[in-house]
């Protein structure tokens, strides 16, 4: 269950009913189409939900995540909150070994985070600040360390999530009220890279106050379309700031699967709740408190 599913259910994200939600998924192949060549019955697969057209200006340039005709399984067409889902062959990725279906369902968020980390080009020894200690924030934090960050700061208001972050081995985990003082106490100048991984006004504003001169701010968290924050062009000019956005996961799903298969990232500690499909409406409506980090829908 992704935060986007909650936003769609509450009418805050662009999806039109009737559509079955669920874009983070893994499962077993039950049937293949007559033209399918590389996928077989019984294969365990993770799904990349994003389907690009291959013909528009951006697709022709290799920028498939910016496709003008982009479709998304679980957003614009029926998704994984069902016993069966139809997926194009090009969007399924076979995994083997000891990878569980729960881990396989995390390939999609890992791949999105991997694209974001690629965009900010973390230098060896860099200081990185992650605003948001949810599942996405903690995936980003692990990938930032893999990319060479010497110190990763995590800002998270929920003490339960801060505890999980520390259990993953991160020492610099603080509340939003503490994070600025702690970063400047260590660096004197601010973080080289700041990643906003929540998608709300307070963290969007704060991100610009934590980055050092010559640094990069990445807006990763999906925010409401009408959210606006004040930005000073003079500060961007004077400090030579780079401000970027990160949108889905072009050409990185296999890399994400490899990282997971090789044990380079821990997602098991991120899954804190397991529910049945029948409980899904209560989760999305808030009747069941979706506490902890990541909730998964388990099919028996």
PLM segments and residue spans:
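Mid-domain Rossmann-like dinucleotide-binding core that forms the NAD(H)/NADP(H) cofactor-binding site
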Residues: 99-178
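Residues in the short beta-alpha loop(s) of Rossmann-like NAD(P)-binding domains
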Residues: 157-158, 223, 249
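C-terminal hydrophobic helical "lid"/dimerization subdomain
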Residues: 205-209, 250-300
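Glycine-rich beta-strand-centered segment in the early N-terminal region that forms part
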Residues: 10-57, 96-98
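Short glycine-centered segments of the SAM/dcSAM-binding site in methyltransferase folds
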Residues: 44, 127, 215-216, 242
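Glycine-rich cofactor phosphate-binding loops and adjacent beta1-alpha1 units
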Residues: 120, 163, 167-240
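NAD(P)H dinucleotide-binding glycine-rich loop of Rossmann-like/cofactor-binding domains
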Residues: 53-131
């Amino acid at each position: 269950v992704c935060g986007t599913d909650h936003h769609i259910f509450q009418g805050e994200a662009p999806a039109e009913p009737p559509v079955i939600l669920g874009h983070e998924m893994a499962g077993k192949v039950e049937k293949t189409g007559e033209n399918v060549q590389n996928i077989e019955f019984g294969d365990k697969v993770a799904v990349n939900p994003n389907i690009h057209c291959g013909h528009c200006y951006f697709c022709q340039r290799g920028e498939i995540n910016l496709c003008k005709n982009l479709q998304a399984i679980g957003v614009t067409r029926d998704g994984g909150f069902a016993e069966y889902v139809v997926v194009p062959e090009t969007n399924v990725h076979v995994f083997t070994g000891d990878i569980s279906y729960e881990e396989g369902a995390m390939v999609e968020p890992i791949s999105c985070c991997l694209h974001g980390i690629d965009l900010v080009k973390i230098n060896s020894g860099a200081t990185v600040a992650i605003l948001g200690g949810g599942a996405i924030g903690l995936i980003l934090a692990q990938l930032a360390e893999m990319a060479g960050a010497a110190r990763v700061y995590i800002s998270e208001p929920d003490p339960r999530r801060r505890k999980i972050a520390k259990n993953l081995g991160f020492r610099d985990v603080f509340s939003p009220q503490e994070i600025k003082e702690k970063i400047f106490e260590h660096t004197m100048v601010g973080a080289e890279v700041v990643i906003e991984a929540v998608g709300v006004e307070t963290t969007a504003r704060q991100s610009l106050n934590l980055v050092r001169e010559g640094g990069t701010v990445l807006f990763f968290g999906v925010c409401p379309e009408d959210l606006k924050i004040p930005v000073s062009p003079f500060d961007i000019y004077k400090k030579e700031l780079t401000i970027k956005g990160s949108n889905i996961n072009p050409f990185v799903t296999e890399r994400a699967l490899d990282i997971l298969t090789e044990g380079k990232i821990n997602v098991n500690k991120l899954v804190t709740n397991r529910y049945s499909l029948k409980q899904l409406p209560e989760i999305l409506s808030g009747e069941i408190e979706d506490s902890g980090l990541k909730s998964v829908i388990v099919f028996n």
